[in-house]
């Protein structure tokens, strides 16, 4: 219970977490997420699954600093041959522990890629999850598998958005081969993941999806946004490979449009706003009282916690691997903020008395949470006001040209989608594997 609470607090502080899809049902389950974010991925699953989860984790994590945390999560060690000094014969113990947990109706989580990574793609799956499921099924346990997609917007950035999508649970066919079940898991996982090269396409996918959603007034549900991003990512990859001249021309058009937006201080979503004075007055009537209360809170929190915030950011720069950067920030931030609160509380207690020290220790965590809310709330309100003023100040012809340019770019996306559908329909039906690969895009 405590481990689950800590996980929820940690991930909801660092990320803006969205959860979508099918709630994991009760009974014996094996959850199968992708693994882009080191130790934060188990915390995300624990925070969003809606039920207690036990994890299968590499045995080396049970040693040293992370040992108590891993044990608190009720993790089951797996002994990997690539880890030095590990006796892989002990995996018999792992299978026995997994079978016992599933027989008791528990939920197990294993990351079937076997590694944490920053490729932006689903890596080839190991067969361990399939072997666990088939082993439990052979012993009479009605186990179901749940594919999960972890989709970060900017995974190393504090307060960026993280979307966790749970797929439909499906039963294990006890007659299936290990390889067939592994392939089915991979296919189901791909439908929940936005696969985009973080160096080439990831930011572009987000940008294009924002533009398209604004122009088409597209459904704003989490599932719809992820589906759009999957199509856009696949379309960009295919276009760059098969029609590079079209890809470059479209990218140039998008960059020109973005430069014009920046020149006028505008965003896609504001081009259709109503700029009437009545709307402005209603906005001010709502936001000014909030600002009177929240701006001092935000300023106080910033002044008090600027030191641990800076130390956390500095420590994260020491990590070159982006798949562990967010984990380093969370762990480093927890340590730096806790020590800072302790130092200030001891200082207050020494100079103002024990009661003042205890009150300081109780008040500062509340100030940190309230300050985070206030900073985000007022930053959003300020951004809205600035965008409204920029739109109001732009000439009507400018707004019209920008909307037309946005519409043209959305039309290009529709043309790309139609092109991919046409190419897919012309693939030879005999080559089923290649056809399935194309359909996944």
Residue ranges of each PLM-predicted region?
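Membrane-anchoring hydrophobic helices of lipid-metabolizing enzymes
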Residues: 1-33, 38-44, 49-53, 67-68, ...
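Short beta->alpha connector loops
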Residues: 35-38, 60-61, 151
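Short internal beta-strands
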Residues: 55-59
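Non-catalytic C-terminal accessory region of glycerolipid acyltransferases
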Residues: 87-273, 281, 363-424
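Alpha-helical bilayer-embedded segments of polytopic membrane proteins, i.e.
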Residues: 285-310, 325-376
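Short, basic, low-complexity termini and linkers enriched in Ser/Thr/Gly/Pro
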Residues: 422-441
């Amino acid at each position: 219970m405590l481990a689950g609470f800590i996980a929820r607090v940690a991930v909801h502080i660092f990320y803006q977490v969205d959860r979508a899809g099918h709630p994991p049902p009760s009974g014996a389950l094996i959850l199968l997420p992708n693994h882009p974010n080191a130790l934060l991925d188990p915390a995300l699953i624990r925070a969003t699954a809606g039920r207690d989860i036990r994890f299968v984790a590499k045995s080396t994590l049970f040693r040293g600093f992370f040992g108590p945390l891993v044990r608190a999560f009720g993790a089951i060690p797996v002994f990997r041959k690539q880890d030095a000094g590990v006796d892989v014969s002990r995996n018999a113990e792992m299978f026995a522990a997994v079978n016992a947990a599933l027989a008791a109706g528990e939920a197990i989580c294993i990351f079937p890629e076997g590694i944490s990574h920053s490729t932006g793609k689903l890596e080839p799956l190991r067969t361990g999850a399939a072997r666990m499921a088939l082993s439990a099924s052979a012993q009479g346990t009605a186990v179901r598998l749940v594919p999960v997609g972890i989709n970060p917007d900017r995974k190393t950035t504090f307060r960026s958005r993280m979307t966790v999508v749970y797929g439909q649970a499906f039963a294990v066919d006890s007659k299936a081969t290990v390889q067939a079940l592994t392939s089915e898991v991979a296919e189901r996982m791909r439908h929940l993941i936005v696969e985009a090269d973080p160096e080439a396409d990831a930011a572009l996918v987000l940008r294009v999806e924002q533009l398209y959603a604004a122009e088409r007034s597209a459904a704003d549900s989490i599932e719809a946004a992820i589906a759009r991003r999957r199509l856009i990512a696949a379309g960009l990859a295919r276009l760059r490979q098969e029609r590079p001249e079209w890809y470059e021309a479209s990218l140039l058009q998008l960059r020109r449009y973005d430069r014009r937006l920046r020149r006028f201080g505008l965003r896609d979503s504001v081009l259709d706003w109503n700029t009437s004075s009545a709307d402005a007055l209603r906005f001010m009537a709502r936001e000014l009282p909030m600002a009177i209360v929240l701006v001092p809170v935000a300023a106080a929190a910033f002044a008090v916690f600027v030191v641990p915030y800076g130390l956390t950011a500095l420590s994260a720069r020491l990590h070159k691997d982006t798949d562990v950067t967010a984990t380093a920030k969370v762990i480093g931030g927890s340590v730096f903020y806790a020590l800072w609160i302790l130092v200030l509380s001891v200082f207050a207690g020494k100079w103002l008395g024990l009661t003042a020290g205890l009150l300081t220790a109780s008040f500062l965590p509340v100030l940190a949470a309230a300050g985070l809310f206030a900073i985000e709330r007022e930053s959003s309100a300020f951004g809205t006001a600035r965008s409204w003023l920029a739109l109001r100040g732009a000439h009507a012809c400018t707004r019209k040209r920008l909307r037309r340019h946005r519409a043209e770019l959305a039309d290009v996306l529709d043309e790309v989608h139609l092109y991919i559908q046409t190419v897919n329909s012309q693939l030879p039906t005999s080559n089923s594997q290649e056809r399935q690969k194309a359909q996944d895009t």
